[in-house]
């Protein structure tokens, strides 16, 4: 997985070091090159294995708080090197980290609990995320990380792009920009064999058709949004850039902590009532964070740093999202979906509070102890509500890696 003696999430530097070692080991097959720089000047690296024109592109690190992808990417690269049949007529290309600036700010390589995870939490504001910025920014304002990613897609014209994502607590699921027939079965078998629940009602894919449990296909343009207030649209993200060349994108999500409550297909007795209750709690929780932010802001020397930008951006989403849950019919009536919305409603204020807490702790601000108690309480309640259990890191990597390979094999049959 990495050059580390212990099993933990590798840093970007460690992923690059491991990729460089792979390239040195098989120089006839592998190349490692720089394809751009981040806003802060950090290099963006692409590892390529094989020389065939037909290509798979694997992207790690698009969300800095989802750390499994770097380790999975290295595992898939090893498999491709060791299994010749995966390279037959196909080259593989690995963007080692799509957002190295964000990765430098998320600092929980071996979290012991959800509270520990949130103490080092960072996830940038939406317009600063490389995959999502095209959905909210005009082309002339796209960050260099986005331009590097779309440039690689333009160069390689992959039949499949796989982007490696994760969730803090829940189950595993796949989002597809076009269906991949045959993927659902190996995905489900892999998850079951590793005791990872399949998240059948993921709020990220609310209202999308499913080609199998936990495998969601994005609706066609013009389909109504489950959450009308959300500023982004996946159909305007980099996920759809591969469509210009006849390709598609698979987003593979794996959990750090699993919950066996996320795959319950039973109908919820009152989903609309439940969503209205969750909306009320979301508003109440967000107000607690906003009060701390308003109190502390005059004392802070820099109110435009990345942690505060991201914290405030998350809080700004809350009123519209709460209104969506109150006034829009539920996209799904299952217990799994209502549970996923419950988790979403916990994450937004918890993440905003966590990033604000990091700023306050750095300044030794008097509001920090109170906010730290709130982050601890919310983290514990989140874990208790969903009966969180840690997924061994090797299982996170194995399941995500298997799903990447299965997607490539089944999408290749479609691409022929």
Positions of the model-derived regions?
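Di-metal (Zn2+ and/or Mg2+/Mn2+) metal-binding site signature of metallo-dependent hydrolases
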Residues: 63-71
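Active-site/substrate-binding loop(s) of hydrolase catalytic cores
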Residues: 53-55, 68-69, 86-184, 188, ...
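Short beta-strand-to-loop junctions in surface cap/lid or active-site-entrance loops
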Residues: 45-53
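Conserved beta-strand scaffold positions in the cores of enzyme catalytic domains, especially
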Residues: 32, 46, 94, 161, ...
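C-terminal accessory segments enriched in acidic
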Residues: 2-9, 181-416
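Short glycine- and acidic-rich boundary segments immediately preceding or forming the N-terminal edge
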Residues: 1-44
């Amino acid at each position: 997985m990495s050059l580390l003696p212990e099993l933990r999430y590798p840093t970007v530097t460690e992923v690059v070091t491991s990729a460089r070692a792979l390239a040195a080991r098989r120089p006839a097959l592998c190349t490692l090159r720089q394809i751009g720089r981040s806003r802060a000047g950090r290099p963006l690296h692409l590892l390529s294995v094989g020389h065939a024109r037909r290509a798979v592109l694997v992207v790690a690190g698009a969300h800095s708080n989802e750390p499994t992808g770097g380790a999975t990417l290295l595992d898939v690269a090893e498999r491709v090197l060791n299994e010749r049949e995966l390279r037959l007529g196909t080259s593989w290309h690995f963007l080692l980290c799509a957002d190295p600036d964000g990765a430098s700010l998320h600092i929980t390589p071996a979290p012991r609990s959800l509270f520990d995870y949130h103490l080092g939490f960072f996830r940038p504001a939406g317009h600063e995320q490389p995959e999502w910025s095209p959905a909210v920014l005009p082309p002339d304002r796209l960050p260099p990380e986005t331009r590097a990613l779309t440039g690689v897609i333009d160069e390689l014209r992959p039949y499949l792009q796989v982007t490696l994502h994760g969730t803090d607590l829940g189950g595993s699921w796949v989002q597809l920009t076009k269906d991949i027939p045959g993927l659902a079965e190996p995905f489900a078998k892999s998850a079951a064999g590793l005791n990872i629940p399949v998240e059948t009602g993921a709020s990220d894919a609310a209202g999308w058709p499913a080609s199998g449990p936990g495998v969601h296909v994005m609706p066609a343009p013009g389909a109504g949004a489950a959450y009308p207030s959300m500023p982004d649209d996946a159909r305007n993200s980099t996920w759809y850039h591969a469509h210009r060349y006849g390709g598609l994108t698979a987003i593979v999500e794996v959990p750090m902590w699993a919950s066996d409550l996320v795959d319950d297909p039973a109908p919820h007795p009152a989903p609309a009532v439940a969503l209205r209750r969750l909306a009320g709690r979301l508003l109440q929780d967000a107000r607690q964070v906003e009060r701390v932010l308003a109190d502390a802001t005059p004392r802070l020397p820099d109110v435009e740093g990345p942690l505060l930008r991201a914290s405030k951006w998350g809080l700004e989403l809350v009123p519209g999202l709460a209104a969506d849950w109150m006034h829009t019919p539920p996209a799904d009536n299952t217990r799994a979906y209502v549970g996923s919305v419950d988790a979403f409603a916990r994450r937004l204020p918890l993440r905003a509070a966590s990033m604000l807490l990091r700023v306050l702790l750095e300044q030794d601000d008097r509001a920090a102890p109170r906010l730290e108690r709130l982050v601890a309480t919310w983290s514990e309640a989140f874990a208790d509500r969903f009966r969180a259990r840690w997924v061994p890191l090797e299982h996170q990597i194995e399941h995500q890696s298997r799903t990447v390979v299965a997607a490539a094999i089944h999408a290749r049959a479609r691409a022929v």
